[in-house]
Amino acid sequence: MKHVLLTLTLFVSFFASAQIVNIPDTNFKNALLNHNPVIDTNGDGEIQVSEATEVYDLNLYDKNIADLTGIEAFINISWLDCRKNLLIELDVSQNINLTYLDVSFNLLTSLDVTNNPQLTRLNCAKNQLTTLDTSQNINLEVFYCYANLLTSLDVSQNTLLNWFFCYENQLTSLDVSQNINLELLYAFTNQLTDIDLGSNINLEEIIIAQNQFTSLDISQNPNLTYLDFSTNNLSSIDISNNPGLLSIRGFNNQLSNIDVSNKPVLQQLLVNGNDLTSIDVSQNPELVILNCGENPIASLDVSQNIGLKGIEFSNTLVSEIDLSNNPLLCGVVGNN
């Protein structure tokens, strides 16, 4: 009888331990034990598999976690935030219900999200990724992958994409022709030489600064409100089909002319460091900031810009300027 009881006790003990999730990282375990809402519902200082399966949202932000072994037990989570940790690798292949995943500000050199088809929002920015496959993430709407080491990126299967932030990588080409729902595209500080935006009619903001563009066609993007093509090699740009532009940042290019005549709501125009000999802002009554320094401009008329608050025209040929009709001016930088 004693032998039977001992065997039964050992079996129960083994079964109980088998139901405890293996979590080798102390900081990860502490984060789970102190999580709000409570995960350790029986208060035994361990995380049982049954407790893990009851979790749907998991916040692990800034917990000094280096290893997320054990995350595979949380099979029902749809929301995982593990930003700002010390993760070198991460396996989310068992977390197939994820719709939100934020692994930004870690040390990841690889990330496999091919088994997470429900993802609508993915943030893997500020890591050390060299490749990333999002072909299976067909529901992706918001995608942050900036500040990595990516040399190529295929988003052709992410047709629902609205926001795409791929700046500060090493991309030499970028195809967004299948992303017809795209509204925000931030692709600055890469090595891009051209981009086809003909299919992106819903585009509202585009930043392609600090690339190697010599031309840019935005004629099919009538909803643009924010345009930044600064620090490229453009000698001209046609913005006649973009009447709703609020901000144009085109400094440090080779522009010899820019026509902003049909921009009634334009508030910011930064075109310093170009080859402009003149600039007409008489039809921009909402203009607040004008930077046109470092251009061979000889004269400047801002009499129609009564809301102007800041103007910079240093290193130009402007010898005098009438600012009597600009009562809100609080910043003026001109020639010495």
What are the roles of these predicted feature ranges?
Residues 93-94, 99, 110, 120, ...:
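Intrinsically disordered, low-complexity repeat tracts
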Residues 56-60, 80-82, 99-103, 120-124, ...:
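Conserved hydrophobic beta-strand positions in leucine-rich repeat
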Residues 318-336:
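Leucine-rich solenoid repeat scaffolds
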Residues 4-81, 96, 117, 136-138, ...:
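N-terminal capping/linker segments that flank leucine-rich repeat
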Residues 82-106, 115, 123-125:
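Right-handed parallel beta-helix
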